[in-house]
Amino acid sequence: MIAMPSSKLLLTATLFFTASALALGQSTITDPGAKQMCASVKDIELPAADRPTSAEEKALAKCSSADLYFGFGKTADPVKARKCAYAEMDRNDKTLIGGKAILMMIYTNGKGATRNFDAAIKLACSLGGGPGDDAGRVYQLDRLKKQNWAGNNFSVCDHSSAREMYEQCAILSERFDKIERDQKLNELTAAWKPADKKAFQTFMEEANRFYEIQAKNGVNLEGTFEIQEEIFFKNNLLTSLQAFERGELPNYTAEEFQKAEAAEQAAYQRTQNGPDTKWGTITRESVRKSQDEWLHYRNAWIAFARQKYPGVSEQSWKAWLDTDRTGMFNRFLH
């Protein structure tokens, strides 16, 4: 099946700054070697000339250094990203991939400011993430400094095993993936008739609701995040549409449809009446919630498919959708 976007996941981190000058937060690093490296740069001052002017900082009151650095929504502007990162630190912005993290990348990669490994290490020493991640970054930056590294692809996500950072790096990765996925969808639908495009838009409104509800309620999130599940569904949608556009359309007999529907219903009833009532983070109630939304989703898909692929019978679409839904259940039932 397929699934889509939604994810308003909390961004967390401990960042403390004064309004005029950077006040480095407490380090979580316990590794002796990394602590020694941090001690060697503790008196390093970040370049005063790199900070925004008062007028610039006022204009940057609602800026996002990540958006400016990576070019989300507009052309990348690393110089403005650098000034924004300082502004974020001054206003105690708690976005995890922002402020210090972006500034560390700017000084390491030499994008938006003169390369400055000592400044990058000083920032890395006080990011306040997982101790292992923080120490790993310090070691990595120290190696790059000794190698006179001249690359531009260092990332805070190079070390992101701590849950919060891992989650935010997954969201960051999805932002890049979305650009590529949307481009492919636009290319795929470019030649569609206006009525087909309109039907697809209507379907996607329901699809997005289902993908969000399914990721929250129908997936065991003990070893994953909602955003990762949504990415799985989104990519699956694109793959399915690409196959359909190649002419690889579902073709089920009446008997195959009956079997698929029976299997889907049996799996669902097992979640409601079987001996188990909980599967990790999934409960009977959460399954009911996702099932209710899936039924709306199935109807929305069939309405779209009736317009776009009129040669495929409704029983074939239902069999295809039922088979996919059974697979969703089996992910946690087996």
Report each predicted region and the residues it spans:
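Detector for intrinsically disordered, low-structure N-terminal pre-sequences
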Residues: 1-2, 20
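N-terminal alpha-helical modules
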Residues: 24-334
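Hydrophobic h-region of N-terminal signal peptides that target proteins for export
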Residues: 14-26
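A broad, structure-centric signal for solvent-exposed, well-ordered loop/edge residues
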Residues: 10-11, 16-17, 120
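Bacterial N-terminal signal peptides that target proteins for export
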Residues: 2-11
